[in-house]
């Protein structure tokens, strides 16, 4: 008698649950970007009297009426995907400034926290590493070591903390005060001086200090994502390189940033 042998199913190239969540998050931000960018464009043209203001407002209102309900539906679906995830339940859901869409992006792009043995590797993946004293940037002909979409997501996290954060907004304010007292990045930059001459001046630009503060806070936040997720999963956790090797004294523990009573965004 001939025996039928059933071949094992082929190994998937990706975790379908993770990729499903990622596609939902990307769809949400793609639609939001279309709405915001188009509205900004028509309003800008109206301000330059290229387009009638009434028409610009009609277009903006139409976009909002059409796309905001779709964004809301996607947000609801994303919430269903993330609500049972360990790092959402244990950490992300308790942070002001992090809603289901940002959390969904973080969870889906990281996938398995076990593949990041150190927080430095996670920082680099999100474009937060410091290379030769500077943040890593795209260079023609060179391989990048970060995910450009993750870098954008990290930027969105920072903007959200500034707008609606609490504990991390407080940390941002502290960093602003620190960098102002320090004189910005501590370096001098070429600026225009008297009579149009180029001179070296200390870094005190508000925009630069703002970006430095956001970057510092976002790095601490992703350190907290890494630590909390690994602790919850029972994986080993090490101190960041600046603490362990460079002797930096300030360490922010993730549990100190849990905010009880937070309303889901």
Regions found by a protein language model. Name each.
Residues 205-242, 246-257:
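Basic, amphipathic alpha-helical segments enriched in Lys/Arg and hydrophobic/aromatic residues
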Residues 16, 20-23, 55, 59, ...:
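Non-transmembrane, amphipathic alpha-helical segments
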Residues 34-44, 48, 80, 160-163, ...:
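Intrinsically disordered or highly flexible coil/loop and linker segments, enriched in small
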Residues 92, 106-211, 215, 225-228:
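Phosphate-backbone recognition surface of nucleic-acid-processing proteins
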Residues 32-35, 39, 71, 104, ...:
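A structural signal for well-ordered alpha-helices, especially hydrophobic packing surfaces
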Residues 257-265:
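Acidic, Ser/Thr-rich low-complexity intrinsically disordered segments
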Residues 42-101:
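Helix-hairpin-helix/helix-loop-helix acidic hairpins
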Residues 1-47:
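Phosphate- and other anionic-substrate recognition elements at nucleic-acid/protein interfaces
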